[in-house]
């Protein structure tokens, strides 16, 4: 099953196709039930993350050797593994998963002079509760699925542009 939800950011043309689950099979509840839908959503989010990573690499030349997955998404086991497999790099779950709140507190502490600078706290922030290593066979399969997802999304946008489907969202002027 393939979920079509969010698209990659594109400042020249930012639009999202009509949300869809493709290859949904009413005759096979195991392949199209709740678990399959959740997995398809998590895979679609991982494809968007991969696309954004690729854009950053293309623009800056920087590559990523690891990813840190924070927040509620890091509490499960499936989504971090999907991310590791789609991105092809280890995904780490930090001990403190609420990184936004922690970052704000650290910046406030540095601003108030509690810490000499932000780097002072770096060693304590590297504690991790789990690491998900990419499975090479899964990564190879996801490479093919990602290419298919990109092409399907491109065609879904064409259908949307032709007025056959309503977009999920379209930026003003797009």
Predicted segments with their positions:
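Acidic, glycine/GT-rich loop-and beta-edge segments that sit at the periphery of enzyme/chaperone cores
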Residues: 113-174
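Low-complexity, flexible helical/coil segments
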Residues: 37-41, 103-108, 127-131
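Activation-segment/catalytic-loop signature of the eukaryotic protein kinase fold
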Residues: 1-102
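Generic detection of intrinsically disordered/low-complexity segments and helix-coil linkers/edges
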Residues: 8, 18, 41, 73, ...
């Amino acid at each position: 099953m393939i979920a079509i939800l969010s698209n990659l950011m594109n400042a020249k043309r930012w639009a999202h196709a009509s949300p869809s689950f493709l290859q949904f099979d009413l005759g096979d509840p195991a392949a199209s039930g709740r678990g399959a839908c959740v997995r398809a959503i998590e895979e679609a989010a991982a494809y968007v993350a991969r696309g954004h990573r690729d854009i950053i690499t293309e623009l800056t030349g920087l590559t990523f050797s690891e990813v840190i997955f924070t927040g509620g998404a890091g509490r499960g086991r499936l989504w971090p593994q999907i991310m590791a497999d789609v991105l092809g790099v280890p995904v780490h779950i930090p001990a403190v998963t609420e990184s936004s709140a922690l970052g704000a507190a650290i910046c406030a502490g540095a601003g108030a002079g509690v810490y000499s600078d932000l780097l002072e706290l770096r060693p304590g922030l590297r504690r991790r509760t789990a690491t998900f290593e990419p499975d090479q066979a899964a990564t190879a399969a996801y490479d093919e699925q990602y290419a298919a997802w990109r092409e399907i999304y491109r065609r879904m946008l064409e259908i949307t542009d032709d007025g056959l489907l309503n977009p999920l969202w379209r930026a003003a002027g797009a």
